């Protein structure tokens, strides 16, 4: 599924920044799509020769050593939701707990809300959510297990204190 280009598109013109920006784009895309799928679509779209293993090495490697081409980076950007045109003009902010694939967010976004925090533990729901919704890396936090941000996951905290 192709999307509008992501905000970093203009930065890819600076070849010196390109490897790190492409790496960042790959990291974002890999939270949405399986590496096997990304390798397949990059190969189909750009005539690349990526495999799941070779993309995994790129993900784990140093950003400045990223070997994906600018063309690959631009295609990956097209798979990531872009910033809505009215993003800065939102009327209120909200959090999306137990988010699923974003049904509640759909309604809140429609009436002018800006999501600042999302929590979803299911891997597949989380990937679908990220594929459907723009998440600003500076304003939005994506969390998997709600217990990671509450007191209930801390062994030194009693049940009475946690609840």
Stretches found by the model and what they are:
Residues 2-163:
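Conserved active-site and SAM-binding loop architecture
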């Amino acid at each position: 599924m192709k999307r509008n280009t992501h905000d970093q598109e203009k930065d890819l013109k600076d070849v010196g920044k390109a490897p790190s920006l492409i790496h960042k784009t790959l990291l974002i895309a890999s939270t949405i799509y399986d590496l096997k799928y990304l390798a397949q679509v990059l190969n189909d779209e750009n005539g690349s020769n990526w495999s799941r293993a070779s993309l995994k090495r790129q993900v784990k490697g140093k950003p400045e050593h990223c070997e994906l081409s600018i063309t690959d980076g631009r295609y990956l950007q097209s798979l990531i939701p872009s910033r809505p045109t009215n993003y800065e003009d939102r009327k209120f902010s909200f959090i999306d707990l137990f988010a699923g694939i974003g049904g509640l967010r759909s309604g809140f976004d429609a009436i002018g809300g800006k999501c600042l925090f999302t929590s979803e533990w299911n891997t597949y729901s989380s990937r679908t959510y990220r594929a459907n919704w723009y998440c600003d890396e500076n304003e939005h936090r994506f969390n998997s297990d709600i217990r990671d941000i509450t007191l209930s996951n801390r062994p030194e905290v009693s049940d009475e204190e946690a609840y």
